Amino acid sequence: MKYIPGVAWVALLALGCATGPAGAQSVDIKTIVSVGGPPVVLNQNSQLNMAGVFMIGGSTSATVTQNGTNNATGILQFGGTNSASIGQAGMNNFAFVGQTGQSATSLVSQLGTMNTGAVVQFSAVNNSTIVQNAP
């Protein structure tokens, strides 16, 4: 039997999903790195949504909205004033927010069968809300 490296298997799997029948699972994966940039707003509507946002700057702001079967978001913010908002609707939802600065505000809202959310804040002023609902 011929050996196929792990990277080749991942490529074949991705190709199979991309060129499969109309009922194949759709995937949307985004990684955003922002240094002193404008606010990040990301909307994802695939069956599998994954987002990673890493921000450094005086004032950071990120909003991620995901509607799909499986949703995962990680936001890391290092700034003076940090703001993060994650909205997820799907069967399985995972959200993580990490913030360090003078003030940190975050909101995580999840509607699904299995919801996991965590907020870690290291700031002088911290405000966080996690709302999880199962249908």
Q: Each predicted region: which residue ranges?
A:
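Sec/Tat signal peptide C-region and signal peptidase I cleavage site
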Residues: 5-7, 15-24
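Low-complexity repeat regions of mature extracellularly deployed or surface/particle-associated proteins
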Residues: 24-135
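N-terminal secretory signal peptides that target proteins for export/translocation
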Residues: 1-3
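Short helix-onset patch at the extreme N-terminus, typifying the N->h transition
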Residues: 6-9, 30-31
